[in-house]
Structures are given as structure tokens and as C-alpha cells.
Amino acid sequence: MQHIVEKENGGLKKMTKKDFKLYGSLILYALLPSVYLLIRMQIVAVNDVNIDIMGQIEWFDLIDEVLVTALTVPLYFLLKPDNGKTAPKKNCAAFLVSIAVYAVFTVVVMLKIGSIAKFMNAENAVQYLFIQALSMLAGFVGTFMVMIFTLNDDDKLVRRLLVSRLCLQVVADWIFISSFKDVGAAYAEIAVNAVIGLIAVLSAYGKGYLKFAMPGKAFLKDWCKIGAFVGIQIFLDNFIYAVMVCKMVNAVSEPGNYWVANNFIWGWLLVPVTCLAEVIKKNDKVRLTMKNCWRYLIMIFAVWLITMPKWKYFISGPMASDGAVIIKIVLPLIPFYITYMISAVID
């Protein structure tokens, strides 16, 4: 199996051709939905949708991030491929446990959504957030399967899921947003995530990546140990962010603008970084350190600097938002995300 790095003269290491192919597929999977977000923003503008309600997903999505991180990050180590392939029984056992845990948390969140929204100064978005909770549960299925495909170097399946998602999202948004406004965006997400999840599971079975089995005690013990550590860390980070930033943003009635700014940062600027981190996690046996990844980070940062003068026009045009206002939110955050770039690839 090829690993994330190979030795060169002098001990310096680099990504392999196979890794670059996977990296490209992951970037497409992450970036093309951002391209579609440009279309969604136009749909939102045409249908006079309340962007401040849709912007509440900014903090609500942190719940999903905590669960996904706690459940999947340990699996990059526990589901190590044998002879280039992961064990189908382990994959299935991990999936069954993960979806059960996620479902329980989803029910709890839905039962407490009124109190959560009130705490975050988002009482006007209770219905939207309630539906989004179901959407995130459906979306987790696809997210889990993409992890399985990534571990098995199946970039073709990742690309197929991407194309399917984009086509379905176009149709779903036009149907649901035009009929149900802001809540329609949540309905569209449920529909698309459910279909993509079904396609992903069937594809995984068809490829032999899943075979029914229940998890063993030793496997669960190791999973819980790593997951608890990772989950607590990301929970503390996100809780502080939600309370200190998102709650304050809601208090001054700016969730819509902050949501757009965050979409620009995470949907465009940080995509190469997050995808690089995914490739690194997959190839955990040889850790990528600053000695051999600095070149990739510098290239990413160089692209930022080159394109920075055009950011405001991009936000004003394709993103159909107030570029002057959004750029004032984005620029002060850049130093923090430079730090994130470094930490993401060496954690």
C-alpha cells in the first residue's frame, strides 16, 4: 500500500501520485457543493428567503461536527486496511453502532430544540432547526460511507456520489425552497441526504465493503477511548465558539452575514486544507509533519494572497451577498485560520 509520504533524497518526503488522485477527488467532493451553494444563494435571493433563519445552521451544525468527529476519527485508525482493503465486517459493525449513537443524539436534540434555540437567541428558527436535525442524521450515512471509500482508495465512488448529490440538490432546492422558503432548504437537505445515503450504502455493499456483523468488546473499548478524547476536545472548542461567537452574532441580528462569511471560508478557502487532513488521517502509519507538508501549506496560502483582492467581488456577485460587509468579517479571521491550517495537518 502506498502511504502519504515517500522518502526522497536527504530524507524529505512527499505525497504519492495515488494520494494526489485521492486528494483531488476529496477536493471535488468538498468544493463542487460550494459551487452549487452559489446557485442556492441565487435561488434564495429570487424567492425572498430569510437568510437569517438559514444562517442558524452556522452554530447548529457544530453538533453534527462533534458527533461526526468523535465517531469517525478513531475509525481511521481502527479500520486500517489489510492488503489495501478494510475488513467488511468491521466496517458494518462500526456503521451500525455509529448510526445508532447518532440517532439517539438526534432524538435528544429534537426533543430539546426549543430550549436550545432559546439559549442561542434563535427562537424564530425552531422549525427550521428541528427539520435540520433529521437532515444531519440522514447526511451522516453518506459521510460515513465516504470515509469507508476513502480508506479503500475508491475515489471513483466518491466522485459518483458527488455528481449524484449535485444533480439531486439542484432539483430539490428548486422544488422545496420555492414552495416552503427557508424551511424548504431543510426539506431539500433531508431528501438529498436520504437518497445519497441509500446510494452510498448500496454501493458499499456492492463493492464488498460491508458485511453484516456486530462489534466486539475490544473494538468498542478502543473506539470509546479514542472517540471520547477526540469528542471532548472538539466539543469544548465548538461550545466556546457557539456561546462566545454565534450567540453574540444572533444577539445583534447578524446570523445571515456571518453564515455567508463562514461558507466562504470553509467552502472555499479551507477546502484544500481539510482535504489534505483527510488524506493524512487515512495514511496514519507515517505521520505528515511540518518538515514535509510545509510546501503544500505555502502553496495554499499563496493562492489566498493572489486571489484576496477579488474576494469582495466574488461575494457580491456569485454569492449574491454584501461583499463589503462580509469581507469585514472574513479578513480579521484570516490569522486564526492560518493557525488552523498548521494544526489541521499535524494533529
Predicted stretch roles:
Residues A103-F130, A302-A324:
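Short membrane-interface helical motifs at transmembrane helix boundaries
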Residues L161-D173, S179-G208:
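Hydrophobic alpha-helical transmembrane segments
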Residues Q2-G24, E123-N124, A186-E189, L198-N238:
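Interhelical loop/hinge segments that connect adjacent transmembrane helices in multipass membrane
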Residues L22-A30, L62, Q132, V158, ...:
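Residue-level signature of transmembrane alpha-helical cores of multipass secondary-active transporters
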Residues I43-V66, N124-V126, D222-I226, V245-G267, ...:
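Interfacial/gating helices of multi-pass transporter permease domains
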Residues I39-V44, F239-M248, F264, I280, ...:
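Hydrophobic/aromatic end-of-helix segments at the C-terminal termini of transmembrane alpha-helices
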Residues I53-A103, G142-V146, T150-D153, P255-W304, ...:
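Small-residue-rich hydrophobic transmembrane alpha-helices
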Residues M120-M145, R160, V260-W268, P318-D347:
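Alpha-helical transmembrane segments of multi-pass membrane proteins
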